[in-house]
Amino acid sequence: LHQDSGVDEAKISELHGNATYAKCLECSKRYELENLKKDFLKSNEPPVCSICGGIIKTATISFGQAMPEREMQISQRKAIESDLFICIGTSLAVFPAADLPLLAKETGATLVILNNEPTQMDQYADLVINRDISEVFSEISI
């Protein structure tokens, strides 16, 4: 959704990656999924990186993979600099990303959590809305 929002890509940190494209696990070369699919259908072979021969997979962070260091640093800096930190549609159960709301709160931000279910961070929030996100957004005309 954030790609379709019109926000400049340079302002987006994808802590958990992105399933709309793929990356080489060795050199991080980006590949478009449609091209990989076409190549696979032609050869019936799993794709390998054209640069280094590494394994290519969707650009999401899988269980056991480290969080992307650069994106974590940017996100931590933005949390510290924020005066309002809004968590939308997240269980806040995956660390270290789940620490970001507390980091923002500890440095003076107002913390808002909007999620269909309660989270373990609700107790720290200034405002908690446990409702369907689409209903809330339609009511406030976002």
Each language-model region and where it sits:
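Conserved catalytic alpha/beta core of Sir2/sirtuin-type deacylases, generalized to analogous enzyme cores
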Residues: 1-142
